[in-house]
């Protein structure tokens, strides 16, 4: 991949203070790819060497993060927030109503931090960052190595070490972030005190793997994908938009879409009697208008007859403006590797039983991607866990929507699990 954007300012070396001679670099870089400005104010710590689970060694690995609040004198009031698939380190962008004084992510009591995952376009090493941190080598693109949820957590632990963190009070996240939460638990209760996994799984199911493959296939089918060897100036937008549409349908439920759109056409002059609807003049007796010829069909064509179609196309376009196709493939492949038992135990049940921390599992009955049954399995098997339901018919996305319920559930759990932090005065 190539770009003409400005190279970053040189970072300042900082020793980690751990006595092992490792040097990290901390900087706020200038734009180097189309996604660099999407998360204003993020900071970067560069880890000089990092070996992935696969055995691949990466050099000069940037990790983007954002933080709020103050680290306590004992460096033990850290709250880690783990982002979902398409999220960034900016918690205020996607869980903003939970962040701030007196809220679940109380910045008067906690040092709140969110670190960006490997493969994401928002600052951490990914297909849109320079190979081994060297811009003369070009961008990773399709050559970005496969990474795992466990890789992310190990890398993020190095960032916390660099920042002087001694103990983590709580780790909270949903969906892919919930997978990270569960992996953090394996650092032990002496390091991580409590966890909150939401709308997630102990291992990626065949159902979720199948949906991910359908999305990747949509991207690879775009003629502009070119086996991942595309440029920033002409990316495979249509494939990425198709993938996003598919994903959106797994994030919501049938009932939520029916309630919101029904058979609405978005036309204020539509007949009151829905039975009198007539087909538009451009209707055609095929399922996909894109299959009529070899000409790519843009998703912003004004041939949407139903509001549900317009919604999907609008959301897909918004997404393609802020995300990268190779990053999407890297992240969805990462999800498929998720398995708490891998390399630890023979079964998922045995792996879950090793988690010692107080655990609040949050599930959504209408979630068709990471089902309530999967949350029940986690809560039933983790020794010190309890399950609470987010009541919503909005499907998987309810963990990002039902802020009032989330805040109430989280604050109650944190008071119960961390009374020393929750009851003390603001820092």
UniProtKB/Swiss-Prot annotation:
Biotech use: Fusaric acid is phytotoxic to plants such as cotton and banana. It has been shown to induce programmed cell death in plants. In addition to a mild toxicity to animals, fusaric acid exhibits acanthamoebicidal, antioomycete, and antimycobacterial activities.
Region listing for Disordered, in residue ranges: 1-35, 260-297
Pfam families tied to this protein: Abhydrolase_1
Provide one Gene Ontology biological process annotation.
Answer: homoserine metabolic process
Bias kind Polar residues: ranges: 276-287
Q: Which InterPro entries match?
A: AB_hydrolase_1, AB_hydrolase_fold, HAT_MetX-like
User: Can you give the residue ranges of the AB hydrolase-1 domain?
Assistant: 77-400
Q: Give induction info.
A: Expressed under high amounts of nitrogen via regulation by AREB. Moreover, components of the fungal-specific velvet complex VEL1 and LAE1 act also as positive regulators of expression. Finally, the pH regulator PACC acts as activator of FUB expression after the pH shift to alkaline ambient conditions.
Domain of life of the organism encoding this protein: Eukaryota
Q: What is its EC number?
A: 2.3.1.31
| Gene Ontology MF terms in the entry | homoserine O-acetyltransferase activity
Report biased composition (Low complexity) as residue ranges.
Answer: 1-13
This protein's pathway = Mycotoxin biosynthesis
Give the reaction(s) catalysed. Answer: L-homoserine + acetyl-CoA = O-acetyl-L-homoserine + CoA
Keyword annotations for this protein, in alphabetical order, are: Transferase
- Alphabetical list of NCBIfam families matching this protein: homoserO_Ac_trn, PRK00175.1
The free-text function statement in the UniProt record for this protein reads: Homoserine O-acetyltransferase; part of the gene cluster that mediates the biosynthesis of fusaric acid, a mycotoxin with low to moderate toxicity to animals and humans, but with high phytotoxic properties. L-aspartate is suggested as fusaric acid amino acid precursor that is activated and further processed to O-acetyl-L-homoserine by cluster enzymes aspartate kinase FUB3 and homoserine O-acetyltransferase FUB5, as well as enzymes of the primary metabolism.
Family matches, as HAMAP family: MetX_acyltransf
UniProt family annotation: Belongs to the AB hydrolase superfamily. MetX family.
Record-given protein name: Homoserine O-acetyltransferase FUB5
Q: What species is given as this protein's source?
A: Gibberella fujikuroi (strain CBS 195.34 / IMI 58289 / NRRL A-6831) (Bakanae and foot rot disease fungus)
The gene for this chain is: FUB5
């Amino acid at each position: 991949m190539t770009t003409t954007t400005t190279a970053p300012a040189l970072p300042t070396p900082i020793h980690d203070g751990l006595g092992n001679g490792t040097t990290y670099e901390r900087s706020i870089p200038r734009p180097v790819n189309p996604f660099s400005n999407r998360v204003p104010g993020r900071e970067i710590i560069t880890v000089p060497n990092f070996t992935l689970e696969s055995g691949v060694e990466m050099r000069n690995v940037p990790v983007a993060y954002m933080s709020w609040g103050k680290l306590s004198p004992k460096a033990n009031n850290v709250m880690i927030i783990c982002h979902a698939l398409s999220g960034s380190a900016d918690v205020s962008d996607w869980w903003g109503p939970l962040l701030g004084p007196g809220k679940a992510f109380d910045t008067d009591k906690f040092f709140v931090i969110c670190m960006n995952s490997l493969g994401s376009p928002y600052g951490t090493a990914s297909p849109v960052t320079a190979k081994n941190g060297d811009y003369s080598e070009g961008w990773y693109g399709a050559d970005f190595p496969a990474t795992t949820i466990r890789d992310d957590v190990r890398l993020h632990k190095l960032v916390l070490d660099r920042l002087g963190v001694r103990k983590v009070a709580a780790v909270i996240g949903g969906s892919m972030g919930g997978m990270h939460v569960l992996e953090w638990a394996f650092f032990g209760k002496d390091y991580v005190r409590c966890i909150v996994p939401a709308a997630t799984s102990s291992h990626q199911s065949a159902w979720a793997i199948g949906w991910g493959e359908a999305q990747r296939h949509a991207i690879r089918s775009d003629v502009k994908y070119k086996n991942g060897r595309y440029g920033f100036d002409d990316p495979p937008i249509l494939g990425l938009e198709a993938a996003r549409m598919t994903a959106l349908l797994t994030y919501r439920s049938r009932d939520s879409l029916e309630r919101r759109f029904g058979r609405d056409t978005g036309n204020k002059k539509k007949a009151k009697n829905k039975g009198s609807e007539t087909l538009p003049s451009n209707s055609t007796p095929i399922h996909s208008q894109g299959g009529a010829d070899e000409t790519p069909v843009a998703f912003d064509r004004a041939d949407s007859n139903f509001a549900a179609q317009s919604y999907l196309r609008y959301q897909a376009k918004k997404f393609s403006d802020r995300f990268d196709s190779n990053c999407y493939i890297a992240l969805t492949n990462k999800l498929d590797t998720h398995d708490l038992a891998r390399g630890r135990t023979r079964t998922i049940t045995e792996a879950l039983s090793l988690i010692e921390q107080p655990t609040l599992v949050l599930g959504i009955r209408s979630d068709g991607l990471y089902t309530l049954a999967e949350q029940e399995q986690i809560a039933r098997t983790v020794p010190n866990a309890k399950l609470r339901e987010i009541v919503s018919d909005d499907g998987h996305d309810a963990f990002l929507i039902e802020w009032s319920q989330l805040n109430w559930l989280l604050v109650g759990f944190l008071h119960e699990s961390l009374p020393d932090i929750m009851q003390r005065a603001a820092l």
